[in-house]
Amino acid sequence: MAVSGSHRPLTGPQAESWTAEYLTARGLRLIERNYRCRLGEIDLVMAEGATLVFVEVRYRSGKRYGGALASVDRHKCRRLLATAQHYMVEHRVTGAVRLDVVAVSPGAAGPQAEWIRNAIEAQ
């Protein structure tokens, strides 16, 4: 997703849309955006083959506070896991699942992504 030729910072929804396109171009299939329940929100629910993939999109326009990945702390991980488990129960998911994080940051030629597969594991 090009942001109309400018190098303006993305908004959260733009970063999520850009990430959905980025992952789709790499073989994943979008199932749902912004799944919400009382426990939290999952930005993207996708599939890679038979594996259900929950995707947390993090965007920071700079590294002042450690960048996008630094914003995924222990509390955020617990909320994401709980929300993913809620989705799995609600949708009767029994197959393989994983939780990925995509950190989006501005680059000279447009957004850049750091995709971490299976970034968050249940303890």
Curated annotation (Swiss-Prot):
Top-level taxon: Bacteria
One Gene Ontology term of the molecular function aspect: nucleic acid binding
Disulfides per UniProt: none
One Pfam family per UniProt: UPF0102
Gene3D superfamilies xref list: 3.40.1350.10
InterPro entries for the chain: Restrct_endonuc-II-like (IPR011335), tRNA_endonuc-like_dom_sf (IPR011856), UPF0102_YraN-like (IPR003509)
Family: Belongs to the UPF0102 family.
Protein name in the entry: UPF0102 protein MCA0184
Taxonomic placement: Bacteria, Pseudomonadati, Pseudomonadota, Gammaproteobacteria, Methylococcales
